[in-house]
């Protein structure tokens, strides 16, 4: 059972109860989160989480705050909690042209993964504009509207620019 968002940590009590029921039935639990929230409820939720898909959006603190409004230190703290609990983790990063689409950025992401034995996989995801209709319905301009979507070719070329690819899928 995978729970994603919005942000499931904002509903941590509900997700914990759901995961507890899953565990009683022998169902694997996966949490898809930004990791920006850490409190007692999030801590309790990790106690019944088998896998965390952690959206590690940026590798530089200033970019994290600028583009997400979240402090990268909070995400790093969440990752440390996953490490401490030995919860299998997949680091996932959406590649956005002109923002984090450089070999150096991917190398930094790989460095984060290499420093945490809980990280079993790194995924580079394509930036998509599937959310644009939601923004339009709300009358809000999509802040990344002028940025083209990332293609499979973009991801392949980016990976070719990174020497050590053994843990990057």
Predicted regions and their residues:
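Radical SAM enzyme core and accessory elements
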Residues: 164-169
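Conserved AdoMet/S-adenosylmethionine-binding subsite of the radical SAM
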Residues: 2-130, 136-137
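A structural motif corresponding to the C-terminal lobe/cap of the Radical SAM core domain
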Residues: 120, 136-161
